[in-house]
C-alpha cells in the first residue's frame, strides 16, 4: 500500500486538485473503527505501510516515548493539526485546487515528521498520536461488538518470551490478556496480526466477537 502514498505525493504536487483524495484516509479510518477498531491503520493506511515497509529498514527501533501516548498530548496534536488545516484553507482558498493543496501540504509535512520520528524511535511512532488514529481509537468499541476483530491469547501463555510485544508496531503488550475470554481489546491495536504470526507456542489467534 505504501506506493499509493508516493504516487499521491508526486501526482498531487503537479495536479493540486488530486490532493482532495486524501480525505479518504481521514474519514475512512474513523468510520471503520466503529466496527473494527483501528483496522484501517494496520491494513489500508498507505503511510502506515510506508513506515512498516520502508522506514523500518532504517529505524533505530527504540521505545516510543510514553508521553506521546498520553491523552493530553494526543488532544493537543488533534487540535494543532486541525488548526493548521484551517489556516491552510484560509491561505490557499476554498477552491478545488486550494483544498487539494491544503491536503497535500498536510500529508507531506506529517509524513516527514513521521519519517524523522521513525528513524529516531520506532517506525510507527507517528501512529501513536496520529489525529485520525486518535479519533479512531476513541470511537473503537470498548467491549467489542458482533464481528469486532480482536486478538485472543490462551491461558497457556506464560508471558515469558514477550515475543508478541517485541514485534508489535505499536509497542503494545498483547500477552497481558492471557486467559481473558474478552481478548486483547486495546483501542490502539491495529489488528495487523504480527503478534499472532510471531508467537512461538501458537497460543494466540484472531477472533471476532459473537455478541
Regions found by a protein language model. Give the residues of each.
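Non-ligating segments of multi-cofactor redox enzymes
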Residues: 1-211
